[in-house]
């Protein structure tokens, strides 16, 4: 019997970008794994990196060929692309791309991100002047010829999670309003991971709030009726995913270090809200935001037993050393409420940013 040998040829079209073409993001890559030769490997030496707002950080990423110490074959240009994964993992946001001498950064990362390039196989990304929104997971992708591989690095920020509801009261925010409410208070909407870490650190809160992935949850360390249910285990209770337009809950916000001074303004008299705003301005500052009082309390140990106005019209005071008449049972940012702004009953907390 005559044996027939069929040879199937697969043709791959490859177009090198024109040297003057800076639109690197539009280049179409066809990914095919070569059967022969060393395989391209991309490695992140650390899966998690910790930093804080205003700092600089390096997200590690290196690439190798399996069973060799070489960085590349030398026959193809190497393309490095960094993207940020959204909290629901449904999208990737472009951060930075490099190929040859071409470099391009995107959106709010422009002017703040660079490749470290400490060696020929170093694709690590440097992020400067870290913002709250930089928190999250980043993907490093390296492409050489027909090969590609990826690694994921998580950027975590030191900070504090706090529950927030507006003057209108409990359960009055849809998802988009919740996002804006956090931004207005010098913070961002918290992720599940951030809320989980806050719960592990003792956060106990009985009102459900939005998280960045669109879920609604709340942390319970001391289960009770009607907070998590009597005779149940502690944990982060999950209400699931709700309509982002019509469903209304509170929100959990996250903030980190600030570049400035938070302080209680010494003033001869108590102030109305409008007088409080003007008093801070006269002192070369602005009335402080809720995120700033939580950051000062949690990260700097700020302690003051005087209730003061904040920018959202609420009145609060931070206690890091519990004592008689000053939050005797626990360290906390105490919430007085949203009093009538014409009441001349409180002081004010101010914030002066450093240039």
From Swiss-Prot:
Residues 160-255, 260-352 form the Link domain. InterPro entries: C-type_lectin-like/link_sf, CTDL_fold, Hyaluronan_bind_Proteoglycan, Ig-like_dom, Ig-like_dom_sf, Ig-like_fold, Ig_sub, Ig_V-set. Keywords: Disulfide bond, Extracellular matrix, Glycoprotein, Hyaluronic acid, Immunoglobulin domain, Repeat, Secreted. GO terms for molecular function: hyaluronic acid binding. Residues 38-156 form the Ig-like V-type domain. It comes from the Eukaryota. Glycans are attached at residues 21, 56. Its main location: secreted. One of its GO terms (biological process) is cell adhesion. Disulfide bonds join 61-140, 182-253, 206-227, 280-350, 305-326. GO terms for cellular component: extracellular space; perineuronal net; synapse. It is found in: Secreted, Extracellular space, Extracellular matrix. Pfam families: V-set, Xlink. Residues 1-9 form a propeptide. CDD domains: Ig_LP_like, Link_domain_HAPLN_module_1, Link_domain_HAPLN_module_2. Stabilizes the aggregates of proteoglycan monomers with hyaluronic acid in the extracellular cartilage matrix. Belongs to the HAPLN family. This is Hyaluronan and proteoglycan link protein 1. It comes from Gallus gallus (Chicken). The lineage of its organism: Eukaryota, Metazoa, Chordata, Craniata, Vertebrata.
